[in-house]
Amino acid sequence: MFRSMGTGTGTKPPAMTTERYEFGPLVGEGNFAKVYLGRHRATGEEVAIKVMDKEKLVRLGATELIKREIAVMQRLRHPNVVRIHEVMANKRRICVVMEYVRGGALYRYFRRGPSGGAAGLREHEARRFFQQLVSAVAYCHSRGVFHRDIKLDNLLVDEQGNLKVADFGLSALADMERREAHLQTVCGTPLFLAPEVFKRRGYDGAKADVWACGVVLYVLLTGRKPFPDEHVSRLYRLIGQNQFQCPPSFSPDLARLVRRLLQPDPDRRITIPEIMEMRWFKRGFKEVTYYIDSNDRLRSLDGLDGEPELYDSDTDTIESSSSSESPTPVAGTPRGMHTSVSAPALSELDRMEDSASLPLPLPLPPRPRMPRPKSLNAFDIIASSPSFDLSGLFEERGERMRFVSGAPVADIIAKLQEIAGMVSFTARTKDCQVSIEATRNGQKGALAISAKVFELTRELVMVQVCKKAGDTAEYRRFCDNELKAGLRGLVVDALPPPVEGGGHGGAAAAAEAE
């Protein structure tokens, strides 16, 4: 079934060189890309590999669309959103390696009615999928992403029966909306378009997504379209006039929710937080509870038999794409191709001339132990601080913070665990990394923080703290009110002088020499 990448035409894999993946059959094809089933050679994991021809993208004017899709997928780490593993490119093609969702499209699971047509799903099944859809959309909005093309074709089901939102090619980012006051582009599938979208008066991306969720829910429950006219202009008129009927089988709670979802006035339409408070929605709803483990993989706390269910993800692409650390090669990188688990911007790929010209911000590999760093970059940054007071040593950059300590690693880890316990957070420790997670989930997901300890010298370590998930304001409050105060006694208030001929003297001397 699988073959090495490099031979064949048509439905066979394109001629590219890779040591990481084997290619299987063609499983999908669109205007801009072909999607192949693939398998990671080392792990055996099945993946979907989206292959795009760079010349065709330019010819069809699709370069910006693909850039946006990759940028959006970099932002998203949620169990109900299809995840991206890595991006590879050579002079001719771009390959996006993604999660393979074996179950296929959601509409395949509709029942058959007496006349042979689709009859939708049972109410409890539709509710479960709708709950997962709303959870995913709420998370996307919290990350500043509006999907803009929510429809049944873009809702997949995995082998465990969980919904996965896919295809962010038409999505918009919140900063686009802020620049333009409202989104202007009419995009998406007519049946799922909110009335304000096709009226071309500007629209709120979040409210348009809520409308599309309402259409999805109606179709899930009935197997029919709420606005059944096939002619686009008449369809738009039905949508604008809100001409749809809830079947008698709908309970009052369900009918109330559907009418609020399909409210043509966006200012009166229900919001995501309000959906989550509706009685029909809350029935049996279990919030997605997940955390990012010490290997940067997404895990659910709701797995079977008390074991965490694994949502595998090789790296936190959000963090790694802005990492200031030195690039480190990934083992098994394909010859003749670039690879980045953090998905490099396509503007860089477009400028690429040869296979050695693209510097990629790859994340550091996991450190099961605490080896001496080969680079003294972190030490140099601290040693060159203008003062050695506490505020200077708690160096903060966006969603990252780091400080230097002379305390034993075991004491630092114990203190981090203690601080987490004081605010009822959980703490998981593996080697020299502590993962701290909030026990309650908000609209933006549970706050998750990673604290890694690195050895600088025999006497000093650096602790790097970064937000992995959740609300940024909540992260900063935790750092300001809990973390800094709790760690105050462990942070060095002055770096020791260099020791000639031993200790950390070589490092300090190098720093002073600069």
UniProtKB/Swiss-Prot annotation:
<dbReference type="GO" id="GO:0007165">
    <property type="term" value="P:signal transduction"/>
</dbReference>
<protein>
    <recommendedName>
        <fullName>CBL-interacting protein kinase 25</fullName>
        <ecNumber>2.7.11.1</ecNumber>
    </recommendedName>
</protein>
<keyword id="KW-0808">Transferase</keyword>
<dbReference type="InterPro" id="IPR004041">
    <property type="entry name" value="NAF_dom"/>
</dbReference>
<keyword id="KW-0067">ATP-binding</keyword>
<feature type="compositionally biased region" description="Acidic residues">
    <location>
        <begin position="304"/>
        <end position="317"/>
    </location>
</feature>
<keyword id="KW-0464">Manganese</keyword>
<dbReference type="InterPro" id="IPR017441">
    <property type="entry name" value="Protein_kinase_ATP_BS"/>
</dbReference>
<feature type="region of interest" description="Activation loop">
    <location>
        <begin position="167"/>
        <end position="196"/>
    </location>
</feature>
<dbReference type="Pfam" id="PF00069">
    <property type="entry name" value="Pkinase"/>
</dbReference>
<feature type="region of interest" description="Disordered">
    <location>
        <begin position="303"/>
        <end position="340"/>
    </location>
</feature>
<dbReference type="InterPro" id="IPR011009">
    <property type="entry name" value="Kinase-like_dom_sf"/>
</dbReference>
<dbReference type="InterPro" id="IPR018451">
    <property type="entry name" value="NAF/FISL_domain"/>
</dbReference>
<feature type="domain" description="NAF">
    <location>
        <begin position="323"/>
        <end position="395"/>
    </location>
</feature>
<comment type="similarity">
    <text>Belongs to the protein kinase superfamily. CAMK Ser/Thr protein kinase family. SNF1 subfamily.</text>
</comment>
<keyword id="KW-0547">Nucleotide-binding</keyword>
<feature type="binding site">
    <location>
        <position position="50"/>
    </location>
    <ligand>
        <name>ATP</name>
    </ligand>
</feature>
<dbReference type="InterPro" id="IPR008271">
    <property type="entry name" value="Ser/Thr_kinase_AS"/>
</dbReference>
<dbReference type="GO" id="GO:0106310">
    <property type="term" value="F:protein serine kinase activity"/>
</dbReference>
<feature type="domain" description="Protein kinase">
    <location>
        <begin position="21"/>
        <end position="281"/>
    </location>
</feature>
<feature type="binding site">
    <location>
        <begin position="27"/>
        <end position="35"/>
    </location>
    <ligand>
        <name>ATP</name>
    </ligand>
</feature>
<comment type="function">
    <text>CIPK serine-threonine protein kinases interact with CBL proteins. Binding of a CBL protein to the regulatory NAF domain of CIPK protein lead to the activation of the kinase in a calcium-dependent manner.</text>
</comment>
<feature type="compositionally biased region" description="Low complexity">
    <location>
        <begin position="318"/>
        <end position="329"/>
    </location>
</feature>
<dbReference type="GO" id="GO:0005524">
    <property type="term" value="F:ATP binding"/>
</dbReference>
<keyword id="KW-0723">Serine/threonine-protein kinase</keyword>
<feature type="region of interest" description="PPI">
    <location>
        <begin position="398"/>
        <end position="427"/>
    </location>
</feature>
<dbReference type="InterPro" id="IPR000719">
    <property type="entry name" value="Prot_kinase_dom"/>
</dbReference>
<keyword id="KW-0418">Kinase</keyword>
<dbReference type="GO" id="GO:0004674">
    <property type="term" value="F:protein serine/threonine kinase activity"/>
</dbReference>
<dbReference type="Pfam" id="PF03822">
    <property type="entry name" value="NAF"/>
</dbReference>
<feature type="active site" description="Proton acceptor">
    <location>
        <position position="149"/>
    </location>
</feature>
